[in-house]
Every structure is written in structure tokens, then in C-alpha cells.
Amino acid sequence: MKSATEQDSESDFYTAAAHLINCPGIETEQTLIEFLQYRESSCQSIKITKRKIVEVLARLGCIDAVPAIGKCLWSDDVYLVENSVWALQILQCQDQIFIDQMIDILRVDTTNQRISIQCLATLNISRSVDVIRPFQESSVPGIKGAAISGIAKLTRNFTRVPEISLNLLLPNQMDRHFAIQDLIDVDAIDQLNEIFAAPVSPVLKMRAVREMYGENSASVVDLNLLSSLDSLFSCDLSAINCVHEYDESPSSEFLVRDLYNTDFSRCYLALKYLSSRSASEIFPMLKESWVEEAHNDYGAHYCFICLFGSIFDWSAESKRWIFEVLLSSISNLRPQFQKSRAASILALAKLNPSMLCELIPEILSSRDSMPWDMRYSLIQSIDNYAELEIALKNKMIFQLSDNDIDQFVQARARMALAS
């Protein structure tokens, strides 16, 4: 990287460090480590660059960086300390001096208690149990949840783990996100029903399922889990507990705007109300909002797709436009819009299942490159097509699932073929 005097702007150091994640190798690692060790400055550009470097080194899996990252635990930059604790967790640090410092950070640094608990528990530092235990009574949900999860992980006593699920219904969305991570960290499969019902992004729920089940055989995926996955992918609003409510019934204009809310609880609540509104009333404002904004807003994009599939009395003209949107969404490869692809398949299956069936040959040509939730949703959609002749249905499901190595796709296909 260039010297400070050669930088074109304060963000150049940071930008260079961020881009080096794409250049793995010894030279990259040495350059980043040297910056951490020898670049001393109180200016903000150096501080934020060091935070990024610590993250990049961890993502590169650079074990040689542990000594340099560990020294950052004594920094007066709390954000650098936070990133360093996380990085040492990722790199599986076993340096006792650094571990002692992380325990001290937990005792005295109120800004980094959650990440410190997570790190010590993940590294299985048994001597941290007595330090972590009192935090189970913290008034801060994210710290309390991490402590309960950490103690369960370290002691194998899971008695208090269900308490974490209470945080899934807190008004603050970040607290709900923390709760899901805390349940993932302790492999709380018995709390999956609570996770499925939580008003959070479906992506978080999918991650919880995948991390808790790991690479287990499809034979351990039971019908209850498949039913929950079906509800998740089809955005079954009756299965979601919203933590917000309206004082009075809002206008349709207000509800459409709430589909852009960053809190999924509010999005789901708006969806519940809009799904019972007249299709002729809300379609013009939905179309206008989609064209102006929602088509390029990945959160709202998903909510609009779910809404399109939850209303069945669209006019013929409205349906033609909606079908175009759904077909475009199914083939949308932009990473941030991936959760909308499975939702679009299920929405199209509800509104026009024969149109989806016509797409199957094209879909099969790119099946192996599709994300697992999309492949799952295709099988779910065909299975739910009651008017489809049984032999043709089974043929399609077999084609969609043949040689698929994903345990959930396998299990869903087995259920469909057995019915």
C-alpha cells in the first residue's frame, strides 16, 4: 500500500485493504500485517483501515497474523478491539496472553462484552465460565443471550437456553438477530419453531436451519421441519409473530410504504393488512411503487413478490404485469435479490401453476447453479399443484431432484414422491 502522503484521499488506505481480500497470498498477508505492526497514527483513516485489515486477515485465514492482531486487543480504539476479538475467534487463537486479555476485556469493557463472550465460548475457554456466568442476568438482551448461550456451550447445561427465544419477540430487530445467532451458537434445534415464527428476514432463518443441521443425512429431516420450511418459503404470514401493531387500520398508501421498512416485523404486519385489501384498490399504487423504487430495493422487492402471491383476485390485466415481474425475478441473478427468486417461484405457482410447469425444461438446464432454496421451492410448487397428473408430477419432481446432494431438497422430494 502507498504511504500516507501518497494517498489521494482518506479512504484510499481502507479501499486498498478491502480490495486485498481478492488477492490471497503471502505478499498480501505480509503487507497487511506490517501495516498493523508499524503504522501508528491517531488519524481516522488509519484507524478504520486497521479495523478492516484485521477483518481481511481473519477472512483470509492468516494464522501468522495472530500475534499482530492480538496486540490490537490493547488498543484504545474500541472498534478495533471488537474486530480483533472476532478475528481471533475465527483464527482459533490459543495464545494464553491474548485469551487472558479477552477475559479482562469482558470484565471492564462494556462496549465489547457480547463479542468477548462469543469468542471465549467458541474457543472453549473453560476458565472463562465464572466470568461469563453473571452476564446471564444482564439487562441488555444481546449480552444476556450470548451469556446463556456461552454457558450452555461451555458447561453442556442447556437448561436456560429457551430463555434466549424470548428475545425473538423483542421490539428491537437487532436483539432478534442476536437471539438467532445465540441459538445457532448452541445448536438449539429444539428452538427452531420459535426461530421460524420470529419476525426477521427469511435469510436468517435459513442460515439457522443450515448451521444447526450441518451436513446431516436427509433421513434426519422430519416432516415437521419440512412443513416449517414450506411455510417459510411461501411466506405464510399466519406462522409469523409480529411484535408491532397499528393503533388503527392504516391507509393502503401507508401500508405500501411500510413494505420498505428495515424492520421485518413491520413489513410482515403491512403484508398481513395488504393481503386482505381489495386487489383493484392496491394494484395501481403497488405498480407505481414497484416501477419507481421497489424493483431495485431488495427488501421491498421480496415483500412485493410475497404480496403478489398472496392475493388471488387480481384482474387479468394486473396478472399479466405481475407474471412479467415474477418471471423476471426468477431469473434475476443479482446476489442481493436471491431470496426473491424462490418467493417468485411460489407466487407464480399459486397464481398460474401451468405457467411454472412450462418453465421446467428451461429451469432444468440451469438447475445445478440455482441456490438450494430455489430448488426446494420448485419441488414444493410442483407437489402442491393438485390438478397435475400424478405421473407427470412425479416425473418433474424426480428431474428436479435427481442427484441433488442437498439434504433438504432430497427430503422434500422424498416427501413429495411418497404422497
From Swiss-Prot:
Q: Which UniProt keywords apply?
A: Antenna complex, Phycobilisome
Any signal peptide, and if so, which residues? none
The parts of the chain that form a coiled coil are none
Which top-rank group of organisms is this from? Answer: Bacteria
Q: Which GO terms describe its cellular component?
A: phycobilisome
Q: Which InterPro entries match?
A: ARM-like, ARM-type_fold
Its biological purpose is as follows: Involved in the biosynthesis of bilin.
Q: What is this protein called?
A: Bilin biosynthesis protein CpeY
Give the organism, scientific name.
Synechococcus sp. (strain WH8020)
Q: Which gene encodes it?
A: cpeY
